[in-house]
């Protein structure tokens, strides 16, 4: 027998469900609940059915891993995640392997309604598709890891990392894991994470994951430089010279190009302002 794509049969979702029922193929989808779901360690995705209407609120029945935020515990839960070279290795001072940590966070986050995502994603072929996700561990770890990077990385490094992250995500989504480009991006990511050591504390409550504490031996944050109290060690006298130097390009531009910038003989700012919207 040959194996081919089911697309060649031109079957609708209902046709596929009926075929599965007639041939005793176990599937979760039913005619009255025709959702297409996928699950793995990292999360659960749901699509099809009423979800194809972008205006329709997802019915509660589509969710299996996460509680409705309204039904989540009133008491928040605090979790500390420790990272070494950007990799989460412990939770609440207990060392865990990756699989155990992710499973634990999925359970903890799901109990508090954390990890529900409803969005339109752009498929490789250009079609927009509405997807519902339940990914508690992913949301918690991403939130915590981002907070750690914000404490250790410089501003420019953070901005560039965002660019690389977008390319990395697209590459994996588009099935190019085994490409040379992926190897290049991996080299950068691994290098960027060599300093990412520290602990982040998050609060899980009613569908939210909020960073409430952070510490790292490699942090660039200095309380003595940032404080507004008498312990302030920043030399405020240095500000005057910095302001003059930093503002010099804008000052020269205003002197040399004032007529154009003021709108005489060139495009006026009013012409690029958005139109006024009438009341609905």
Set out the residue ranges of the language-model regions.
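Basic, glycine-rich polyanion-binding accessory segments appended to enzymes
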Residues: 123-280
């Amino acid at each position: 027998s040959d194996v081919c794509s089911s697309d060649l049969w031109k079957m609708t979702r209902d046709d596929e469900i009926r075929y599965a029922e007639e041939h005793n193929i176990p599937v979760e989808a039913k005619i009255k609940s025709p959702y297409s779901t996928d699950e793995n360690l990292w999360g659960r995705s749901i699509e099809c059915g009423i979800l194809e209407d972008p205006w329709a609120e997802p019915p509660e029945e589509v969710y299996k891993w996460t509680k409705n935020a309204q039904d989540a515990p009133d008491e928040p839960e605090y979790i500390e995640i420790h990272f070494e070279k950007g990799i989460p290795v412990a939770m609440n001072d207990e060392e865990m392997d990756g699989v155990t940590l992710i499973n634990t966070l999925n359970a903890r986050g799901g109990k508090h309604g954390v990890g529900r995502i409803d969005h339109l994603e752009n498929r490789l072929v250009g079609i927009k598709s509405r997807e519902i996700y339940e990914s508690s561990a992913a949301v918690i770890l991403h939130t915590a890891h981002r907070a750690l990077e914000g404490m250790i990385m410089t501003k420019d490094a953070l901005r560039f990392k965002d660019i690389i992250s977008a390319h990395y995500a697209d590459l994996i989504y588009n099935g190019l894991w085994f490409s040379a480009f992926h190897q290049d991006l991996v080299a950068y990511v691994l290098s960027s994470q060599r300093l990412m050591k520290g602990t982040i504390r998050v609060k899980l409550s009613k569908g939210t994951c909020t960073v409430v504490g952070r510490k790292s031996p490699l942090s660039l944050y200095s309380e003595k430089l940032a404080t507004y109290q008498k312990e302030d060690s920043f030399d405020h006298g240095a500000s005057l010279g910095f302001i003059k130097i930093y503002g010099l390009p804008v000052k020269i531009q205003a002197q040399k190009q004032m007529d154009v910038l003021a709108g005489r003989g060139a495009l006026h700012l009013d012409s690029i302002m958005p139109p006024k919207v009438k009341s609905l």
